[in-house]
Amino acid sequence: MWNPDFFEEHGYCIIDDAISESGVAEIRNTINRLCDENLLKKAGIGKEGSFELDQTKRGDSIFWINPLEAQGGTKEYLDFMSEIIISLNREFYMGVRDYECHYTRYPVGTRYMMHSDKHKHTSHRIVSFVFYLNENWTEEDGGTLRVYTEGNNFFDVLPKAGRLIIFKSEMLHEVLITNRIRESITGWMLDEQRLF
């Protein structure tokens, strides 16, 4: 359940069963179709001149979502996120004006090293969100999201189907090595409108 007070105090909130099981399955099927059609692209680190592809640092492949074309489970999820955005703006005057997100797939043996989603190339990201699609996920499957809090403490989030984590984009986090294919929708709320 979305808890704005918890988010304000801790900088994050975890919501289980954010959308219907059928919606989760539809999104998973969409990612599998994109993979079969070779439309998922290897993700890199940095922008323009500093862009690099390095599977040891970041191993996922992605496909950007156009919200205007979203259907089925993806639309159900984006509608849910729109309600969260309304809540954040109403409760905390956060100034969220837009969002961007992509389908994400990590092959077995990959990870994403510790990083922050907000830096000089992405300064307009204010809140990050990850929605997981992985059925019957266990700790032995790896692929945990580790989020760092003050004092170098951290908490781990198991990427099980239907789970959504929302957290402030400046928080350091990493994806630990996954022992199964790991799928999600990953995105960011922005304090400016995107230019297509």
Stretches found by the model and what they are:
Residues 1-90:
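Non-heme Fe(II)/2-oxoglutarate
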Residues 103-122:
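Conserved short histidine dyad/triad with adjacent acidic residue
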Residues 23-25, 108-112, 174-175, 194-196:
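Short catalytic/ligand-binding loop motif for oxyanion handling, primarily in non-cytosolic enzymes
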Residues 119-120, 125, 134-196:
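Catalytic core of Fe(II)/2-oxoglutarate
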